[in-house]
Amino acid sequence: MDFKNKKWLFLAPLAGYTDLPFRSVVKKFGVDVTTSEMVSSHSLVYAFDKTSKMLEKSPLEDHFMAQISGSKESVVKEAVEKINALEHVNGIDFNCGCPAPKVANHGNGSGLLKDLNHLVKLLKTIRENTSKKITSVKVRLGFEKKIPKEIAHALNDAPVDYVVVHGRTRSDKYQKDKIDYESIALMKKILKKPVIANGEIDSVKKAFEVLQITQADGLMIGRAALRAPWIFWQIRNNTTKLPAVVKKDLVLEHFDKMVEFYGDMGVIMFRKNLHAYAKGEMQASAFRNCVNTLTEIKSMRESIEEFFNQEMLQSEVPLWVELNQKSV
């Protein structure tokens, strides 16, 4: 990965959302790196056949990272060895930022920020045992209090290719007013490896503001992409205009991929995606209530066609075939 010639754009791993169908849709809008949903090392080791489905990738994904969590060195080592057998995976990202109590309270995710020596030891274990070219880590600014300097200095001893920094502590969770890009900038000054900024990047304007403040080598975007997967295309082209794509067709394509990947269960699983796509639209509440009752492919497809038929996202910006040509 060459960080000298462009700012890289990453899709953040989001549990329950960034599966293969969604990543396939987003990839068409110019995102450089996609990452799996977080997979626990324990699940990889003891339920590999089931868990490995989360690590499948689409033909479009040329830079695909498997994100794992864990705190026990022997289990992390074995999980890495499992991933080695998956030739389509390009690298391993280690989650040290998840704030969920069921993860952090057991010393995983952001819980590792309380023991930086152990965190670095686990990263060394990953690097020593992986056959993949890329190893990365995703962190927050601290657990209860901000310790950006300490984290940055510790990670300088870790064998990683880049560091993703979410600009909040674990205690901050996802509070908007807690985002701190200045601390990411501080870590960028200390770290001797590329830094990717993450957190509350929800527009083109915000993207370039964050790059200016942090001097980061790239951006990772998650929740904003759920409703507007074209945000990566907008950043690439430095425009607030929308690509000329019919939103209905985009949503239907995503739905069809969900059904193809999950079968009939994809109908129910797609409800949460529809909630995101419909956010801010007229009659969105009624639409959400409707789709929450649907379980059949035919009825769900009809509801999607009816609701999104009212809306055409158009502009004079080039079509799909010209996406992914520019870089920031």
From Swiss-Prot:
Catalytic activity entry: a 5,6-dihydrouridine in tRNA + NAD(+) = a uridine in tRNA + NADH + H(+); a 5,6-dihydrouridine in tRNA + NADP(+) = a uridine in tRNA + NADPH + H(+)
Top-tier EC class: oxidoreductase
Necessary cofactors: FMN
Cystine pairs: none
E.C. designation(s): 1.3.1.-
Family assignment from sequence similarity: Belongs to the Dus family.
PANTHER family: TRNA-DIHYDROURIDINE(47) SYNTHASE [NAD(P)(+)]-LIKE (PTHR45846:SF1)
Protein name as it appears in the record: Probable tRNA-dihydrouridine synthase
Protein species of origin: Helicobacter pylori (strain ATCC 700392 / 26695) (Campylobacter pylori)
